[in-house]
């Protein structure tokens, strides 16, 4: 009787560990950076994505042209982009 309770406890702990690990790996950011966005918006568009994991292939979830969308990233900021601005994060 004691060994069956131990087995149930171990299986339960294993399942909890797997579920927790799945949640952690869901927010992995893809390499490279979002393209520079110098567009001034009066109103933001509804987001087409929330994280890089929402985008297929190499595409990243970037704020570009008034809304979050999946775009092909660039290796570095384009000429004329604000080098000090973190364009991969939403504006405050």
UniProtKB/Swiss-Prot annotation:
Disulfide bonds: 34-62, 41-66, 49-61, 55-70
Residues making up the signal peptide according to the UniProt record: 1-23
A GO BP entry: defense response to bacterium
Keyword Signal: yes
Chief site of localization: secreted
Organism domain of life: Eukaryota
UniProt-listed InterPro entries: Elafin-like_sf, WAP_dom
Physiological role: Antibacterial protein. Putative acid-stable proteinase inhibitor.
Name recorded for this polypeptide: WAP four-disulfide core domain protein 12
Organism of derivation: Aotus nancymaae
Gene that produces this protein: WFDC12
């Amino acid at each position: 009787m004691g060994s069956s309770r131990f087995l149930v406890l171990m299986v339960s702990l294993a399942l909890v560990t797997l579920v927790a690990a799945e949640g952690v790996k869901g927010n992995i950011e893809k390499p490279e950076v979002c393209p520079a966005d110098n567009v001034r918006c009066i109103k933001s568009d509804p987001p087409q994505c929330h994280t890089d994991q929402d985008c297929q292939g190499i595409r990243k979830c970037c704020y570009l042209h008034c809304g979050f969308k999946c775009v092909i990233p660039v290796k570095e900021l384009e000429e004329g982009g604000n080098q000090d601005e973190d364009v991969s994060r939403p504006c405050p």
